[in-house]
Amino acid sequence: MRYNQFSYIPTSLERAAEELKELGFDLDLQKTAKANLESFLRKLFFHYPDSDYPLSHLIAKNDMDALSFFQSEQELSKEVFDLLALQVLGFIPGVDFTEADAFLDKLAFPIHFDETEIIKHIHHLLATRCKSGMTLIDDLVSQGMLTMDNDYHFFNGKSLATFDTSQLIREVVYVEAPLDTDQDGQLDLIKVNIIRPQSQKPLPTLMTPSPYHQGINEVANDKKLYRMEKELVVKKRRQITVEDRDFIPLETQPCKLPIGQNLESFSYINSYSLNDYFLARGFANIYVSGVGTAGSTGFMTSGDYAQIESFKAVIDWLNGRATAYTSHSKTHQVRADWANGLVCTTGKSYLGTMSTGLATTGVDGLAMIIAESAISSWYNYYRENGLVCSPGGYPGEDLDVLTELTYSRNLLAGDYLRHNDRYQELLNQQSQALDRQSGDYNQFWHDRNYLKNAHQIKCDVVYTHGLQDWNVKPRQVYEIFNALPSTINKHLFLHQGEHVYMHNWQSIDFRESMNALLCQKLLGLANDFSLPEMIWQDNTCLQNWQERKVFGTSTIKELDLGQELLLIDNHYGEDEFKAYGKDFRAFKAALFEGKANQALVDILLEEDLPINGEIVLQLKVKSSENKGLLSAQILDYGKKKRLGDLPIALTQSSIDNGQNFSRESLKELLFREDSYRVISKGFMNLQNRNNLSSIETIPNNKWMTVRLPLQPTIYHLEKGDTLRVILYTTDFEHTVRDNSNYALTIDLSQSQLIVPIASN
């Protein structure tokens, strides 16, 4: 374990003493440091009628237990404080460590003993993570140190788990959205699942906009998947034009219906554990799936601003600007009289994507988004540089396939009976509009590009993204983060994992940092919390997170690729082509080991190479035919220990998100020995070699200069490492599988790898 503590708010002695007193700690500035520490420790054992017994189970020195120490005349020293602090946090002498000083250095322990600062040390210790993954104060509250009185209690600028999660209110309302996405002449109704504590105070809201939450149709999804085996189409030379179109909602009328009290209820919904953490701390949770999902009406428009509007309507309702009904019969309305109107959205992938879309509307009431692994341009999710390009792990998927997966109205047999014919008509229109034939950018994709509206974002923004996420690739967060207005507060956590959540990792206090931010933004708490704009997980060592100023630098280093002419054959034998088509992982293994059709260049680094931004391959290329698909991957190559990309459970159910509520496992990315690590990758239709809007012809056997931008990253390579550059055509995971008989030639003497370099 190593501490990377970003959530602790430095506190004055007076404020620290006041907060400790509010928690019931009997500390006195006039007492000695030793007496205050003893009083603090005894309070920790509030379950025991006699605190001598648990105190005797701690050691103050290697030859003296804590009870004996406090009964002695010996003075408090750094050695004693450090040893006791480690044990209070759950570290066991002789098991987790033998030499405390060396262990503290390894931990990067954030508290440095000074006898005159004992009150502040105790305050800091309570806000520090235990071995279990919880802060000490959260651990104590989870054991019942504070009663669940359904009121707010704060410590170090963060809300504590004092809301009773055994008496939660679970209710359903139906919000009227200014939409008619299925064109039935009726405004769409949006189902909203609400979970909130019983409280006399107006509550802020965490909203998870999740098209998955009312169920998914995997059968329809699988039937809709596309075959990837097809020839790369030769496109006509042309210029693509699109226009920015404002979304115009339909008019709604003020509701004059009586207020209803008899609301629909529910017993369970698949919740997000970060939401659960905040539910116990006085934040209502709502789950909304939007248009075209079970319990709602309308068509699944998948990614456009009509879908975004269906979530925006819920925020409008929370602020009294939209109508909600008690049921589909619309006989009574219901008001959000329990809400303070301030909202933060949460969730990963599609969920985080909807958060970004919502933020670009500038809707009042949306105070903050926590968007994890989020899409900012749907074109860049299903296409790349004029190519159909599947997200990593999902060959054959497209946006209409996702529509089939998430149109959960068809899971309700009655809805299927009444509406499926119309749904199929609208789905067919969507399938035509996305233009899978060419892979080109068009108006359909432009309407699903949130980057063009990034300037309208006014809420606080928190993004997390994995630099090994080849599903929602790093370009998605790179472009939106760098497009955000300079006037807003923005934060980015870049980790070394894949498409994963990170709130329950051991090495980073993400949960507590979000607590401090949300208390500021949604509860108006003046806690003086300041979070760095960007925090990056170091790829060279375990559990090390560093502040970074920018994602993408202008300083570059050009690496020569060689002097040869290299030929890349596109065609595979029939058996090999079929085998790779059945198992793209076998293709990837062959590719990375230099066994697939490719041009391969290994560069032995003579000095460290700290990459920060978008690597570009500038290549001299020619094709034997009037078409060409170019793929590239950059590897950190050679056997060594690297961080894995999937977090591993260190302990089971050790994190309590409330008071015995919604427990979850503590996880972390661990080192493993492997032969390579993908640093970046990219794909291009050579007909789109100059830009996305220009489709050009490819002259047979004529040299072309191509700039292929790869996925942005931050990655540190060290002197002596090998950088492997792989150039090839068909990628059996991502691109169409064209097995026609053409070849590309690369002139390495006129080609370079252009690398953005991080400053010291």
Curated annotation (Swiss-Prot):
InterPro entries: AB_hydrolase_fold, Galactose-bd-like_sf, Pept_S15_Xpro, PepX_N_dom, PepX_N_dom_sf, Xaa-Pro-like_dom, Xaa-Pro_dipept_C, Xaa-Pro_dipeptidyl-ppase/CocE. Keywords: Aminopeptidase, Cytoplasm, Hydrolase, Protease, Serine protease. The active site is at residues 349, 469, 499. One of its GO terms (molecular function) is dipeptidyl-peptidase activity. The keyword Mitochondrion does not apply. It is an enzyme of class 3 (hydrolase). PANTHER family: COCE_NOND FAMILY, PUTATIVE (AFU_ORTHOLOGUE AFUA_7G00600)-RELATED, PEPTIDASE S9 PROLYL OLIGOPEPTIDASE. Belongs to the peptidase S15 family. NCBIfam families: PRK05371.1-4. This is Xaa-Pro dipeptidyl-peptidase. It comes from Streptococcus pyogenes serotype M6 (strain ATCC BAA-946 / MGAS10394). The gene is pepX.
